[in-house]
Swiss-Prot record:
Family annotation (Pfam families): HMG_box
One GO-annotated biological process of the protein: activation of meiosis
Region (Basic motif): 14-27
Disruption phenotype annotation: Mutant mice develop normally. Males show defects in reproductive organs with smaller-than-normal testes. They have severely impaired spermatogenesis and the absence of postmeiotic spermatids or sperm in testes and epididymis. Female ovaries are degenerated with apparently fewer mature follicles at the age of 4 weeks old.
General function of this protein: Gatekeeper of meiotic initiation in both male and female germ cells. In complex with STRA8, directly activates the transcription of a subset of critical meiotic genes playing a central role in cell-cycle switching from mitosis to meiosis. Temporal expression of MEIOSIN is required for meiotic entry decision.
Annotated source species: Mus musculus
Protein name: Meiosis initiator protein
Length: 589
């Protein structure tokens, strides 16, 4: 009973937790609607392999809505600013607070702790951009700004803003999203046709003293500059990893370009405009600003990129590091100029200096670990070093004997340059050595670098050392001290000349089985049928310096009878003999 009660309770809880089909359908509909809403955003999301979660899509949509709300608030503020009669203006930082009560009638009251929007008006005047450090008495500000123009006097601050600064420093408040910016006109002591700078601060966690903390004064000799009546203050937020922390934007509005906005502004990057930029395009600096503010400093400040990336490496590295390679670090890296990538050792330099000098070959100057010589280069090396081998191709015995070219496939022999054959000759002064008589390939086995050779090559080397030096292939005389090999008899020549053809006639037959069948056929052959094979074997042995009996050799060599192949012998035996079953037949599998 207790077990059934527990199972029933568990099933009830599982039904309560599991969503119903209608809930699943509604949830799917909400997800589809959210994705459709994300597709409506002009700034498309980056494509990636993993799908975006609902939270990421929702945050993307909310960020875009925030961006639209900021633009709407800014437009309302600008419309309200330009629709005002312009009589009462707000005294911005750096102006004289004794201008009268009419200058403050349209300003934000001092009881408000969030002066988010304010503007200044001054005569257009070019000024060098200077950076001023933060005030030491104020706490650490995560939203540090770069002051491009300085205020004239730090003490002449609007009283209302000063009170707000004190209140916010004591009780720092947070701007709520529902707080809308208010417009505050500025005073124009001249003709009033100057540009108006509107600072729109939309960050949610900004103190009131944050704007004032970025103001400083440019003092020359302890006294302010008397020629400057009003100076504009430019604030540019530093690019942060989090996009939401960069909310302060700087907009330049003139009386003639009040309704023009930047059409190509990015909603996720800090934007500022200049007077020379067309249609208020972002990230545009005038010629005077470019002359006074270096591009490398700008990129270092905004993007956080080191200034060393914008200068030549030869200006940064010391001379003892560069030595003679300044060309390769400046023009060689920044321009498409040919340069060698080979670092030669002192030994290689000595060898190359002895050889003929010529124009450098940049294609063949790269050192290789595995070097394979071509046929033409191999012939040169063979003619210089000298070697000999035996041709064991049995099929050439039926026709004319031809001399085949031998290709060289050397082992792993260290690093040397293809463009310097003298290095190759120096690495192997004793010349190339031969392998067994059945192998037609030469193996280059130098004596100085034999540590990396396999065991088989070492054994071959020992046998070759016991045989003594080897003469070239064309020489017919035996070398002194060389041990002659055994003579080739008629049966061996018969097998060499017929084994391959026997295997071709019966595909799949093993070589040992073919040899056994040929041996059975050899036993049934007469002396006259065996004589051509014995003559061919004796001639081959004399040509290759093997042990040959001298008796009756001249008369046998003059006989030019051609040997009969195995299939002709089988046909003749089949016609003569009555018992065909006793004759050996090819065992085709």
């Amino acid at each position: 009973m207790l077990g059934s009660d527990k199972f029933s309770c568990f099933s009830d809880q599982h039904r309560a937790r599991s969503p119903s089909p209608t809930d699943r359908k509604d949830k799917k509909n909400h997800t589809n609607k959210l994705r459709e809403l994300a597709l409506l955003i002009p700034v498309t999301m980056k494509t990636r392999d993993k799908k975006y979660t609902k939270k990421e899509i929702l945050l993307r949509v909310l960020h875009y809505i925030q961006y639209l709300q900021r633009n709407i608030d800014m437009t309302k503020a600008l419309l309200k600013l330009h629709s005002s009669n312009g009589k009462g203006r707000f005294v911005g930082p750096g102006l004289n607070p004794s201008a009268g009560q009419t200058q403050q009638q349209h300003s934000t009251p001092s009881s408000s702790q969030k002066p988010s929007l304010w503007s200044t008006s001054s005569k257009p005047r070019k000024k060098k951009f200077t950076r001023v450090s933060e005030h030491p008495s104020w706490p650490y500000n995560p939203r540090r700004s770069l002051a491009l123009d300085q205020a004239e006097n730090p003490n002449t601050i609007h009283p209302g803003l000063k009170e707000e600064n004190e209140e916010c420093a004591t009780y720092p408040g947070v701007l709520s999203p529902s707080t809308y910016p208010t417009t505050e006109p500025s005073v124009s002591e001249g003709d009033g046709q100057g540009a108006q700078l509107v600072f729109l601060d939309m960050a949610q966690n900004i103190f009131a003293y944050d704007i004032l903390s970025d103001h400083a004064v440019e003092v020359q000799g302890g006294e302010p500059n008397a020629d400057i009546k009003v100076q504009r203050s430019f604030f540019l937020t530093r690019a942060q990893p989090c996009v939401s922390s960069c909310r302060q934007k700087l907009f330049l509005c003139t009386s003639s370009e009040a309704d023009k906005e930047a059409p190509d502004s990015d909603p996720w990057l800090p934007v500022w405009t200049s007077e020379d930029s067309p249609n208020g395009s972002p990230l545009a600096l005038g010629s005077s600003q470019i002359n006074t503010w270096h591009v490398a400093d700008y990129l270092n400040e905004i993007l956080g990129v080191s200034s060393s990336l914008f200068s030549s490496p030869s200006k940064i590295l010391p001379d003892h590091v560069l030595e003679d390679g300044t060309y390769f670090l400046t023009e060689g890296l920044l321009e498409s100029s040919p340069a060698t990538c080979e670092v030669e050792s002192p030994q290689e330099k000595e060898v190359s200096s002895e050889g003929p000098t010529g124009p450098p070959n940049f294609q063949s100057s790269v050192s290789l670990d595995h070097c394979y010589l071509s046929l033409s280069e191999n012939v040169k090396v063979l003619s210089n070093c000298g070697s000999s081998s035996e041709s064991t191709d049995t099929e050439s015995l039926w026709g004319q004997e031809e001399v085949r070219g031998v290709a060289t496939y050397p082992r792993r022999t260290g690093v040397f340059s293809l463009a310097q054959p003298s290095v190759l000759q120096q690495a192997n002064p004793e010349g190339l050595q031969t392998s067994s008589d059945e192998d037609r390939d030469y193996t280059w086995t130098p004596t100085g670098q034999s540590s990396g050779l396999p065991v088989a090559s070492k054994k071959i080397k020992k046998v070759q050392a016991s045989q003594g030096p080897v003469k070239p292939k064309d020489s017919r005389k035996a070398c002194p001290g060389q041990v002659k090999k055994k003579c080739v008899n008629g049966f061996i020549m018969f097998c060499r000349m017929n084994r391959k053809q026997y295997i071709r006639a019966c595909p799949g037959t093993a070589s040992t089985a073919a040899t056994k069948d040929l041996a059975q056929l050899w036993r049934g052959m007469t002396l006259e049928e065996k004589k051509p094979y014995c003559t061919k074997a004796r001639r081959f042995s004399r040509q290759n310096n093997r042990i040959v009996k001298q008796e009756n050799s001249s008369s046998e060599d003059d006989d030019g009878e051609t040997p009969k192949p195995f299939y002709q012998l089988l046909a003749e035996k089949a016609q003569v003999s009555l018992g065909l079953t006793s004759l050996p037949t090819p065992n085709c599998q």
